Amino acid sequence: MIHDDFQQTPLTSYGTQKLVGELILADYTRRGFFDGVGIRLPTIVVRPGKPNKAASSFFSGIIREPLAGVEAILPVPRSVVHTHASPRSAVGFLIHAAGLDGAAIGPRRNITMPGVGVSVGNQIEALRRVAGADAVKLIREEPDETIWKIVQNWPTRFDAKRAKALGFTAEENFDAIIRAYIEDELGGKVGAR
C-alpha cells in the first residue's frame, strides 16, 4: 500500500520526471509563485481511441477493443493487480482540485487520488458481467516480457484517505468504470454482446 508520504524512488525516467514535477510544484507553492495542487492519478481506463505503445495501454485495450468487437492482446498474467479510475473520474479530480482552498490542502501539495485496485482477472470478469462472454472471448493472452518487466515493478494499491477527506471521489468497482466508458464513449451501446 502506497501512502501520500511514501518515499519515492522511481525506477524509470518517466517516474523521475513525475517526481521532479511534484517537487517543483510544492516548492513554487511554498514560495508563493502560485497556489498549486498535484494530482497523482491512478491509471486511467478505459481510454478512448486506438492502442498505443505505452506499457499500460493493455489495461484499456483489454476492455475497449472487445467492447468494439475487436481482438485485444493481454501481455501480462491475469494475477497482476493495479489501481484504476475512469476518464470521467479524472476530469472530476481536476475540477474538484481547482476549487479547493489551499489552506485545506496544507503544505503537502501532492495528493494520491482514489481508484479501484483490481487484478487483470477481475477486470476481465467485470467485462464479462457488463458485456457478456463474447466480449471476453476476444481477449488473447500473449505474454510480452518487455511489458512484464516494466509492469511488475509498479505499485499495485494506493491509500487515498487524504484525497477522500478532501472530497475527491472515484468509482467503487471496475464494473462502474466499464459502464462509464460505454456511456461516455459508445453512446450506451456495446458492439460485442
Model-derived features: where do they sit?
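Amphipathic terminal alpha-helices
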Residues: E141, P155-A165, E172-R193
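Hydrophobic alpha-helix immediately C-terminal to the catalytic Tyr-X-X-X-Lys motif of short-chain
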Residues: V20, I24, Y28, F58, ...
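Amphipathic alpha-helical segments that line or abut small-molecule/effector binding pockets
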Residues: R64, R88-G99, D175, R179
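Mid/C-terminal beta-alpha module of Rossmann-like enzyme folds, strongest
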Residues: P66, F93, A97-V151, G188-A192
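NAD(P)-dependent short-chain dehydrogenase/reductase
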Residues: A26-V81, P87
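Substrate-binding strand-loop-helix patch
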Residues: G49-A55, S79-G92, P107-L127, A180
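Catalytic helix-loop patch of NAD(P)-dependent Rossmann-fold dehydrogenases
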Residues: M1-G38
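Short-chain dehydrogenase/reductase
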Residues: F6, L11-L19, N52-S60, T83-H84
